[in-house]
A protein has these predicted regions:
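N-terminal hydrophobic membrane-entry segments
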Residues: 1-161
Length: 161
């Protein structure tokens, strides 16, 4: 009976060790970075490759470095010549600093979408309909520049609107 009890105890300990070690080893893909927190304090961004964390003490947040394309929902805008128009946009952006993207803002994707929506309304509200229709490329560049400046502190680079 002692042999069965001690072997089941060893088996239980072995299972717990395997579970803890499986939680300690993470794989970060080539297009991702893992932002590591140790006891709530930032350690830095690691990856790509195999990352070993201290169980229970370390926590990792994965951040994709790939370009994200996001539809900006249609916005009802009144132009400067009081013509109501409905405009939507597509914004392309990517994370250039994973630590800033995790620490500076709670959800960088949602925040970038909100900035793009408000910027779209404000930029188009300053122009009349004819200017908007004839100089769409200039309006897109202005939108891209403003959104990029506002998301820069978050480690986000807006490439195209």
């Amino acid at each position: 009976m002692d042999i069965i009890t001690s072997s089941s105890l060893y088996l239980g300990i072995l299972i717990v060790i395997v579970i803890i070690l499986s939680q300690a080893i993470k794989i970060v893909k080539e297009y991702e970075r893992g932002v590591i927190f140790r006891l709530g304090r930032i350690v830095g961004a690691k990856g790509p490759g195999l990352i070993i964390l201290i169980p229970i003490i370390d926590r990792m947040v994965k951040v994709s470095l790939r370009t994200i394309n996001m539809d900006v929902p249609a916005q009802e805008v009144i132009t400067s010549d009081t013509v109501p128009i409905k405009v939507n946009a597509v914004i392309y952006f990517r994370v250039i600093d994973p630590v800033k993207a995790v620490i500076s803002v709670e959800n960088y994707i949602s925040a970038t979408s909100q900035i793009a929506q408000t910027t779209l309304r404000s930029v188009l509200g300053e122009r009349d309909l004819d200017t908007f229709l004839s100089k769409r490329e200039k309006v897109n560049q202005t939108l891209q520049q403003i959104v990029d400046e506002q998301t820069d502190p978050w480690g986000i680079k807006v490439s195209t609107v």
